[in-house]
A protein has these predicted regions:
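A short, proline-enriched helix->beta-strand linker immediately N-terminal to the Walker B motif
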Residues: 114-118
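Conserved ABC transporter NBD signature motif
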Residues: 13-21, 33
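Helix-to-loop junction immediately C-terminal to a conserved catalytic motif
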Residues: 5
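P-loop NTP-binding/switch modules centered on Walker-like glycine-rich loops
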Residues: 121, 125-129, 133-211
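Conserved ABC ATPase "signature" region
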Residues: 21, 66, 72-90, 196-200
Length: 267
């Protein structure tokens, strides 16, 4: 997520957004492009400046990008954004430490929406929140997506959230993309052994239905110094000598369903 926004410089490859390679943009071009690309951070406690009020935090991108220079108009925009994310106007001059996690994350969402972006990278946006608040934030984000035509890149380890939220799912293991498909297709036909193990861990809310849990064994390969071959080979129950020596490529096994696994060849 941070590489897409170039908060961390990618070491190789391309990041194509709106037909343009983000990696080739200079500082000034990137500054303009970031109006269309925003980020909602994982931790609502660490991502907000404790020295600034709610209004100052939400107004900051508008000031930095010089989108609204008139202070009164900027404050009107802040109030509008607060209303959109469900924050009461009376909170406008409060500080982050005076608010709970749910309200803090709403501030982060309002800040991300300030410049009317096309894309928002959501880095585990509910994982640090109480379970009772998670659903509220997810429903808010879904409503905003429908109202504003937003595109989310939603990074999470919670597969129940993914099933509820995503149109398309990309599964990664140690930095490698191993399976990608529309949400319904991936949940119905998980193909990569790691994806199958992930989905087997989701509880089934039924006494009649049971799902066999796949327990992975073996040591996790170092992501810094990975061994040759497939990065999942050390834990895969179906791994062959080829898996341990040759890295599989991501390929399409059926329309819109991509898998990086030697075992899918010929399917």
């Amino acid at each position: 997520g941070r590489s897409i926004l170039r908060l961390i410089e990618p070491t190789s490859g391309e990041v194509i957004f709106d037909g343009e390679d983000v990696c080739k943009k200079n500082k000034n071009e990137l500054r303009l492009l970031r109006r269309d690309m925003q980020l909602i951070f994982q931790d609502p406690y660490a991502s907000l400046d404790p020295r600034k009020t709610v209004s100052e935090i939400i107004a900051e991108p508008l000031k930095l990008q010089k989108l609204i220079t008139d202070p009164k108009a900027r404050m009107d925009r802040v109030r509008e954004l607060m209303q959109v994310v469900g924050l009461a106007d009376r909170l406008i001059n409060t500080y982050p430490h005076e608010l709970d996690g749910g309200r803090r994350q709403r501030i982060g969402i309002a800040r991300a929406l300030a410049m009317k972006p096309k894309l928002i990278v959501c880095d585990e946006p509910v994982s640090a929140l109480d379970v009772s608040i998670q659903a509220q934030i997810l429903n808010l984000m879904q409503d905003l997506q429908e109202q504003m035509g937003l595109t989310y890149i939603f990074i999470t380890h919670d597969l129940s959230v993914v099933n509820h939220f995503a149109d398309d799912i990309a599964v990664m293991y140690l930095g490698q993309l191993i399976e990608k498909a529309p949400s319904e297709l991936l949940f119905d036909k998980p193909t990569h052994p790691y994806t199958q193990a992930l989905l087997s861990a989701i509880p089934v809310p039924s006494l009649k239905k049971k799902r066999e849990r796949i327990i992975l064994k073996g040591e996790i390969t170092s992501p810094i110094n990975p061994k040759p071959g497939c990065r999942f080979a050390a834990r895969c129950p179906y791994a062959t000598d080829r898996c341990r020596s040759e890295e599989p490529v991501l390929r399409e096994i059926e329309p819109n369903h991509f898998v990086a696994c030697h075992l899918t060849e010929g399917k």
